[in-house]
Amino acid sequence: MSRKNQAPKREVLPDPLYNSKLVTRLINRVMLDGKRGTAASIVYGAFDQIKEATGNDALEVFETAMENIMPVLEVRARRVGGSNYQVPVEVRPERRTTLGLRWLVTIARNRGEHTMIDRLAKEIMDAANNTGAAVKKREDTHKMAEANRAFAHFRW
């Protein structure tokens, strides 16, 4: 791995429909094989379903879901004196968003509904209601951090 300068983070442009950078990042996360048009139609289709089902603004429901999914704490492996400890650390804001989106899309892909639009819409609505597998993933992560709280003094 190169020891030179870290590559600069590229700025994500807000999407044209909702004018939100978070939606653009969701589209990028859903995208497979560079097919952005397909990914965008999946995300916008899911947002349309959310609007029909809840009657609320889909962007607000999505943002609520993201708040419920994003972790505050996680554990990191730290080697001290020949043994590995799972040390709880706070998650930086950028990583919180990244993990939340990653968990949302991965779990939506593994759901049982027929189309990806259905799966994504249902998972977002579940997360907004504080249920669903993505929220459970966050709770499990927090539980791990809480269980390993004794090793918090190994933080670096």
Swiss-Prot record:
* UniProt function note: One of the primary rRNA binding proteins, it binds directly to 16S rRNA where it nucleates assembly of the head domain of the 30S subunit. Is located at the subunit interface close to the decoding center, probably blocks exit of the E-site tRNA.
Alphabetized HAMAP family for the sequence: Ribosomal_uS7_B
Indicate yes or no for the key word Ribosomal protein: yes
Q: Which GO terms describe its cellular component?
A: small ribosomal subunit
* Recorded name of the encoding gene: rpsG
Entry's family note = Belongs to the universal ribosomal protein uS7 family.
**Superkingdom field:** Bacteria
Q: Which InterPro entries match?
A: Ribosomal_uS7, Ribosomal_uS7_bac/org-type, Ribosomal_uS7_CS, Ribosomal_uS7_dom, Ribosomal_uS7_dom_sf
The Gene Ontology biological process annotation of the record reads: translation
Subunit-level organization: Part of the 30S ribosomal subunit. Contacts proteins S9 and S11.
Q: Which UniProt keywords apply?
A: Ribonucleoprotein, Ribosomal protein, RNA-binding, rRNA-binding, tRNA-binding
Protein's UniProt keywords contain Transmembrane helix: no
Renumbered to this chain, the signal peptide range is: none
Name of this chain's protein: Small ribosomal subunit protein uS7
A single GO molecular function term of this UniProt record = structural constituent of ribosome
- NCBIfam families found in the cross-reference section: rpsG_bact
